Amino acid sequence: MKKLVFALLLTVMVAFASAAQTREIYTNNNFRTLAQSHKMLAIMPFAVKLQLRPKEVEKNGGAEGVAKLEEREGLDVQQALHSYFLKQKESNDLTVEVQDPARTNALLAQAGLTASQLATKTPEQLAQLLGVDGIISGSFSSTQPMSNGAAVAMNLVVGMSAPTNTGKLVINIHDGKAGELLWKYDKSLSRGFGSDTNTIVTTIMRKASRQFPYSKEFKG
């Protein structure tokens, strides 16, 4: 009897965890139609908001220093995502190319666009400027920078046993022609140690690999 109860409880917990993971990810019902001709995507520098304590703000050079740190963090996430996609491409598990961030950022700079000004442009405008078919953008908010070693671990946040969140990473993909949101991944993060930006981004993306629409594993 106890074994039966345990088995039923385990089944419910697995189902709950799966449902929680699904809620974190949105895929446009018309994805295949909108993205069927996509060949190249570009990753924007991420918008980062660090909610640091007063002493940490002072340690990082005040508000101006924190702003510079946030900008660096945004570039780190951009680069980490690109590195992840390169590995997927090498494994023959990615159906599109991803523009080198160096080219992306150079074109943005030539157009006079700083990271803080990206939100003033539509996905269509950015795609035309960069010569790509889709735009990957997003945001990261946390009480700790990802790149300083006091990192954030990637524990799945589910139900009653959920750990205290210390941040959130949101990844969006928009179509470059219609501007429609094609895919969104909204991931809460929990406190941990020993991880850097690449490790965090890779772990997060692996959790969503089968639901990433440009992956050959995608069944949607």
Please provide the spans of the model-predicted regions.
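Short, flexible active-site loop motifs that bind/organize anionic cofactors or intermediates
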Residues: 10, 116, 169
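Positively charged n-region of N-terminal signal peptides that target proteins for export
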Residues: 1-5
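C-terminal/domain-edge helix-coil "capping" segments
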Residues: 21-52, 129, 140-151, 158-220
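Sec/Tat signal peptide C-region and signal peptidase I cleavage site
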Residues: 16-20
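Charged helix-capping and loop-helix junction motifs
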Residues: 120, 153-156
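Bacterial N-terminal signal peptides
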Residues: 7-15
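Residues at beta-strand starts and edge strands
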Residues: 6, 134, 163-167
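N-terminal segment of the mature soluble domain
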Residues: 47-137, 176-187, 207, 211
